[in-house]
Amino acid sequence: MPVTKCPRKVEPPWKGWDRKAQKNGLRHQVFAVNGDHYVGEWKGNLKHGKGTQVWKKSGAVYEGDWKFGKRDGYGSLSHPDPETGKLRRVYSGWWKGDKKSGYGIQFFGPKEYYEGEWCNNQRSGWGRMYYNNGDIYEGQWQNDKPEGEGMLRLKNGNRYEGIWERGMKNGHGRFFHLDHGQLFEGYWVDNVAKCGTMIDFGRDEAPEPTQFPIPKVEILDPDGVLKEALDKLMKPEEEEG
């Protein structure tokens, strides 16, 4: 009686190739078709865990946390300096879904940087900005601009404390002219002081005091006059139709 043998099941070669191509755990270096390369941890064929990504075209380098193929967690981004070619750190902080989110520091230049909160790659929340000209802004941000309460301290020591909107002084605020020994308190519209009061403030200690002190207000109801002017500014009369 003939003996029948069942053929041994052989795994197709492509299955082995596919299994070897699946990236999980630590890989020393993986290159993309465009020349980008990544060194670090993988999960389910996606960058996941700690890793370093280098973009060939821009030369940018990211070192930090990844989650399912996106920068997520804490990490640093560096770009090559256009003059020296050396890597220069441009951001260190938290990421979410491949975007800057949470607390982080962004370097715009050698002396210009921002430290504070981010949301979707924009400065949003509380933050402090150091400008190249020596000015410093500290306060609230929204959509990458000062928005809400904040203080701008100028290089010469003068400062504004008050409300900001769309990156400009808008609303109630106080401007300390410490170089001249005066204080203005009032209402701003798009960086222009519209109405308010000016008083002497630390005039005796000011480096460049005004020639004469501010005279006493002689009108009967200065507060009422100021309130009336402010009301008109806040609620302009409707144009006659």
From Swiss-Prot:
Tissue localization of expression: Expressed in testis (at protein level).
Region annotated Interaction with TP53, chain positions: 206-240
Ranges of the MORN repeats in the UniProt entry: 38-60, 62-84, 91-113, 114-136, 137-159, 160-182, 184-205
A GO CC term assigned to this protein in UniProt: acrosomal vesicle
Keywords, ordered alphabetically: Cytoplasmic vesicle, Repeat
UniProt superkingdom: Eukaryota
Region (Interaction with MDM2): 6-35
MF terms in GO: protein-macromolecule adaptor activity
Primary residence: cytoplasm
Cellular compartment(s): Cytoplasmic vesicle, Secretory vesicle, Acrosome
UniProt keyword Nucleus, yes or no: no
InterPro entries noted in UniProt: MORN, MORN3
GO BP, sorted A to Z: negative regulation of signal transduction by p53 class mediator
Chain intervals for the UniProt region annotation (Interaction with SIRT1): 76-100
Subunit record text: Interacts with MEIG1. Interacts with TP53, MDM2 and SIRT1; the interactions mediate post-transcriptional modifications of TP53 by MDM2 and SIRT1.
Described function: Assembles a suppression complex (suppresome) by tethering SIRT1 and MDM2 to regulate composite modifications of p53/TP53. Confers both deacetylation-mediated functional inactivation, by SIRT1, and ubiquitination-dependent degradation, by MDM2, of p53/TP53, promoting a proliferative and cell survival behaviors. May play a role in the regulation of spermatogenesis.
PANTHER family (alphabetical): MORN REPEAT-CONTAINING PROTEIN 3
Protein name: MORN repeat-containing protein 3
Upper classification of the organism: Eukaryota, Metazoa, Chordata, Craniata, Vertebrata
